[in-house]
Amino acid sequence: MTMQTMTAASGHDAEAGTPPDGPLLALDGITVTFPGVRALDAVSLSVRAGEVHGLMGENGAGKSTLLKVLSGVNQPQAGTLTLNGTAQRFASTRAALEAGIAIIYQELHLVPELTVAENLMLGQLPSRLGVVDERTLAARALDALERLGEHIDPGIPVKYLSIGQRQMIEIGKALMRHARVIAFDEPTSSLSARETTQLFRIIRALRAEGRAIIYVTHRMEEVYELCDRVTVFRDGRRIDTFDSVADLDRDRLIGCMVGRSIEDVYGYRSRPAGDVLIEAKGLAGPGLAEPVSFTARRGEIVGFFGLVGAGRSELMKLLYGAVRPSAGHVELNGKRVAFGSPRDAVRAGIALCPEDRKQEGIVAIASVADNLNISARRHFSPARVLLDGRRERELAQKYIERLAIKTRDGDTPIGALSGGNQQKVVLARWLAERIDVFLMDEPTRGIDVGARAEIYNLFYELAEAGRTVILVSSDLAEVIGVSDRIVVMKEGRIAGEVAKAHATPDALIKLALPR
């Protein structure tokens, strides 16, 4: 569906979103305080009709609190909120929705057991004589799905949909309520590349209709691709608003978010490399088009860069024993090793921090201490019969302090932590195992810039201690800023290697692009 047909289908919705002169949404001097914390400090922000306005900042910068003010969850102690020229004060989320503001949160607010149609019309189900009018319900749901370009059966329960499809249902709910302002909170964090492309298409269509879009993200590439303007928050304050994203220097944007220069974020520290620690010789397997060979030395951070489908994650799984190679082998400290499982790799000194941290790296409902001790327990209780609770608590506390993991204590569910602190717990798990080779697959994805700097510092400490870090990253600035040298993969094979002195975005992209 094109933007034109989507706009035409929306009819009066687009008209309803047309403001008088000035911004569609304006916040002036908004202040929100909690016991001992000023979450928002006299924040002012304006969002125009027909624009995508990005919000960036580290965790705790105030972005989520701002969304909660817009949605009526949090009541400001000072300041005014104006919508379409009229001052508003929302006592509830329902009041905000009725006024025309919808929030698409990271954790989607759908009822899994209800159908697509029922979720789309939740709270406003059409009825006759107190009975749901199924025909009208289905017709309205189909209309909403058509406007989104989604071919989904409105009669199936939402629990059978993908994350991307569920997100489209959330957007459909906002359209059904004629929302003029739609805010997205980290919307691509769980989406595939195809689903992200679909989401961006919809957001551009909503912008073309004259709606005001607020887009909260940690991902700078998304800001440059999608946003017209961007506002940066730090420590509850609005630091700056940039009116032309296309002309915005990336280093300046990072500096605004963290209050320091990009050099300080990556903080690269050179060090001498030692002997070869790990070597792949003719390694072949699923996702690799030809045998792969490379070496990594003690004290090195070796970056692996490539586009989606280049085979980097598949190579990491072969090194980690998660997938058995069809040919070739791995050598560790000059000795040939073969792993029947990841457990064998860990015992040999190789660990993987997987790309999908939430699904493969942590047990979200378990505590920080339990997640940290998953592998170390075999040292406490070789027979695996009894758990040593005291030693586990002591180990957890040791690494909470050593890695500055922001958590109340080791009993806190890891799912309650930020992405950066979850990643620190995964790293701590392997530090407790005396690992020599750290395979880091997209380790900072979805993590704010400040937490990234802390993780990079951990990498440098590991390398300085004679360990090897293999960093798989799709972030050009990251892989150039942190790595000692960079291996570029393309279409399941190694396309080349670039020394740090010659590592530029153009050099890496030229090697990574398909033939």
UniProtKB/Swiss-Prot annotation:
Keyword Nucleus: no
Protein's UniProt keywords contain DNA damage: no
The entry's keywords: ATP-binding, Cell inner membrane, Cell membrane, Membrane, Nucleotide-binding, Repeat, Sugar transport, Translocase, Transport
Record-linked SUPFAM superfamilies: P-loop containing nucleoside triphosphate hydrolases
Lineage top rank: taxon: Bacteria
Positions of the UniProt region annotated as Disordered: 1-22
Function in brief: Part of the ABC transporter complex AraFGH involved in arabinose import. Responsible for energy coupling to the transport system.
Family to which this protein belongs: Belongs to the ABC transporter superfamily. Arabinose importer (TC 3.A.1.2.2) family.
Name under which the protein is recorded: Arabinose import ATP-binding protein AraG 2
